[in-house]
């Protein structure tokens, strides 16, 4: 699923140019250098990026868990790379291992705004009720949030509705332009005693056009990590639980999907993630999310552009710099 953009403002279809952040003000975030000019459009974009970055750091992050690799939509430029991911489901026993480690971290339940069950499309998972109960068993006071496109919600089983109600889950429904009665889905969830809202993965222009941001990746890793980190609308705010690790963002955590599909050579360095078994308390996660990561060098935020929502062609050009 693609994340809703809350970053630097985008106008028209032109690429956003996000240059050096306020380097003199963000030394604690790993940037270095001199303060920028103050009388240019680039400086304005820079200021916006920095302001958004600071707002993000004062908000509690979510911890996202992809319980399904694939999706029943096929969105171009999906930041979870679902259109090109091999179909697959997170096994409850694998999730339980991670939850057991997560539960041992002091203050972790209060630290995250919510544990988000997503994908891909989480409603495709045949063991979703069991997964919801696992999260509640290990994290009794955490907010559980199901993030879905809603297509399958009208056909949800009584078992699933009961589980979501009993664990106190929320439902975040992303309203894609598919002709579905999304207001009706919210009312359906409410009738089962479940809080549901519309929001999340799709942005809408002033003209009413649904769009994503295309966030191209530079396989060569020649981008400035500090600038990418400051400009990123996701880093440190939508953290990812994957294979016994916590990553600062979804796209960075799931780079292996690009390698598998396109033969790219993206790689993770030890500083790109936290091993669950090594985390003592939530303060360590907070420190981790506030700093640039080696993999930030892959994000070409200076080439971000707005694209109308539509189907993926599954071509490399949707995710990689320099591909046609």
Spans of model-derived segments:
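Accessory C-terminal segments flanking Radical SAM cores
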Residues: 216-324
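Conserved alpha-helical substructure of the radical SAM core
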Residues: 18-146, 153-156, 318-324
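Boundary detector for helix-to-coil junctions that initiate low-complexity/charged tails
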Residues: 1-17, 21
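Flexible, charged surface loops at secondary-structure boundaries
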Residues: 107-110, 164-166, 290
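A broadly conserved sequence feature marking short terminus-proximal activation segments
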Residues: 16-47, 200, 245-271
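Conserved AdoMet/S-adenosylmethionine-binding subsite of the radical SAM
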Residues: 125-243, 247-252, 257
